[in-house]
Amino acid sequence: MIKKYRFLIARRITQISIMVLYVIANIYGINILMGNLSSSLILITIPLSDPYAILQMFFAGAFLSFDILLGAFFILIFYMIVGGRAFCSWICPVNMITDLANFLRRKFGFNQIQKKQPASRNIRYWVIAISFVISFFMGLAAFELVSPISMVHRGIIFGMGFGWAAMLVIFLFDLFVLKNGWCGHICPLGGFYSLVGKFSLIRVHHNAPNCTACMKCKEVCPESQVLHMVTKTSMPVLSGECTNCGRCVEVCDDNALNFSIKNLKKENENEVR
């Protein structure tokens, strides 16, 4: 039983542990991990910076210290190894809300009613561009001011204010309006990390001979379009939109999906998105 939820359990432990570390740093001064998801320090020494936030600051004309740039470099290298959108499924607190909405959509059969996604996944890339333009003209990191991720994160650490409202809006939007609406279509941070994810080393790999076409993987996957190869051919998931959440691996009873290291010599396959 646990095997079918091993990655889900690991993700929840990771997400909650990170929030707890931020909380105890703020309340008790135990500075194992201090700051927030945009800028943090590990043991008051190692800087970590959100590269997307840093880019907004750059366009806003802010001075970027060496520590900030070094922190962004650390984060980029990390997610180029484990998968850019691993942030979305393993770190971001909003993922717990959207996962619940997606679970209820499956239970209530909403996905069968809305089989075709009515919105483009490219919206988030437009949001990225717009955030850079607004940051340039306003002189501040535009998305950070209105980010539901920041609202929820600050709410968990300092007490919910608008955090509750942000959580409720995202939950209802994903449940009733659009599957994976926030994370998969609108969130610019998810869009940014999907670009980083194109270079990631750790990938989900499909082994076609083992596949019995049960389609459980596509049913649970928040980004099911990345599993276009299922039942067709053996190959890794090449799309940066994969969150490496591991749900497809967990539910596959045929051992047709597993995590593997990207084959650096074989990257000429055309990606179908």
Question: For each of these PLM feature ranges, what is it?
Answer:
Residues M1-M235, G240-T243, E250-R273:
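Non-ligating segments of multi-cofactor redox enzymes
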